[in-house]
From Swiss-Prot:
One example of a Gene Ontology biological process annotation: terpenoid biosynthetic process
The entry's keywords: Isoprene biosynthesis, Magnesium, Metal-binding, Thiamine biosynthesis, Thiamine pyrophosphate, Transferase
Function: Catalyzes the acyloin condensation reaction between C atoms 2 and 3 of pyruvate and glyceraldehyde 3-phosphate to yield 1-deoxy-D-xylulose-5-phosphate (DXP).
Name this protein carries in UniProt: 1-deoxy-D-xylulose-5-phosphate synthase
Family: Belongs to the transketolase family. DXPS subfamily.
Amino acid sequence: MLQQIRGPADLQHLSQAQLRELAQEIREFLVHKVAATGGHLGPNLGVVELTLALHRVFDSPHDPIIFDTGHQTYVHKMLTGRAQDFESLRKKGGLSGYPCRAESEHDWVESSHASAALSYADGLSKAFELSGLRNRHVVAVVGDGALTGGMCWEALNNIAASHRPVVIVVNDNGRSYAPTIGGVADHLAKLRLQPAYEQVLEKGRDVVRAVPLVGEVCYHFMHSVKAGIKDSLSPQLLFTDLGLKYVGPVDGHDERAVEVALRSARGFGGPVIVHVVTRKGMGYGPAEADVAEQMHSTVPIDPATGQATKLAGPGWTTTFADALIEYAGKRRDIVAITAAMPGPTGLTAFGQQFPDRLFDVGIAEQHAMTSAAGLAMGGMHPVVAIYSTFLNRAFDQIMMDVALHQLPVTMVLDRAGITGSDGPSHNGMWDLSMLGIIPGIRVAAPRDATRLREELGEALDVDDGPTALRFPKGDVGEDIPALERRDGMDVLAVPASGLNHDVLLIAVGALASMALAVAKRLHNQGIGVTVIDPRWVLPVADGIGDLAVAHKLVVTLEDNGVNGGVGSAVSAALRRAEIGVHCRDVGLPQQFFEHASRGELLADLRLTDQDVARRVTGWVAALGACVSEAEIKEHLD
């Protein structure tokens, strides 16, 4: 049946029995396809019926449907004519794992950073009103943690004050509300329905009513208090108190019930909340059995078991996690903060070992950073573990709440540099540029597992300002020993005997292995290369100037944007020191990159060791070294 769905219009004639059959087929399709490619399986299994209902009730793309945390759009893609492309999911030139405007007119925004959909919806509804397009609804689907982000509530505050037709679908899969709201409300609702509770309540009612004169009055008073407490904790009041109409809660796996609720909401003609309760991982045993994450995001798996088809080697994240636990075991002042991602950032084990020292603040990076500042003011040393790309959201807090106060907060930036298959929104290629302008911050980029452990320890010993460590996604690789330590920097290679000191190659973090491969190629051409790892890449160490004066050319190699990165900082530092050596930056161009593997992107950007060696050889030749173009090609090909 799925093969017959070319667009939302094909859903309109289906019966309820056919819709149930289609939902089952979609789930089987999801498991089969995502098992092969990897991707966000659990969230999409949970929104099958909801997405079917959305496309039956609303006229996409005339009525924009905006998915917050865009990883829950796989079913939306299937229903808008892209099911045949799922073999290429998250692969170069294939289907994006997030909404993509270039793929379909049904994808309005390329959303992947959480809590933004309501603001998009607010703006779109205003634009439609100003353009006289009053017959267009805007639908925003939030949930999967997005409502823990403050931006959602800022948008709700504005939407509620309007009369524009914005339909907000809250996908409540158990991860949408903060525990003090959703957890207590759900607990009371379950408790009230338990037979044992009802029996106790019945006996208590009889006892109280039996008291002479005041019994009946006391009973009604106690019943009113109980009802008031329950109502005050109800999710509905979160929204109705803002002036929003509310429909629900609705069983999100009953397509007909969801459809009825959405049609009712569409008829209001103003802002309305539709509260839909779903189960992440619905219909797939291994996902439902994964209590921690419901298989939120997976690598390629065996669909029969849910187990990974390839065992990963030791990873950067695991290395960090183990080291942090080791340091925290020796120091009670070390605490950790995560923005709703304890598993992906390696903090789950930390929380199990030190449950009172891990703080999951939800998708609230701004709050995470200023809360860390408060912890530091109180004598703690907080470690904020966060994806590099999400650090952008907390820039003002890092600058004004942490750095201005010279507070010892350590930021650990996972997924730095090119991450690949998650696409342009997840590459961590701006952190060095952003952090480089913050006064007093120190930034380390470990090249291997040993250096990660060492530099984390060094960061935790800093007590007069913020620090940051950055490392990429994936396996950590072999350790790279240093030949010597010089002025706090590691020298990894020196010119071979008989060669001049032609090039000083400064390697940033995990690109040290590439730098050594480049140096080997250049040595084979008679170009002498010194390779150093500064360890702490920002601010620029004074010792770099001392090394630079002994070379003809300084080249920086980094997986950050070349604008404002380490290369820019090194060039500026050498100019300030009036060191006249030539400088060149090798890094990422200032643009957004489509999804592909890390290796494919580096090859496309000419950031392989062969490409970099060819560029450096050309620069050396331009400075007067006797290397011909023919020799360059002969040795590099």
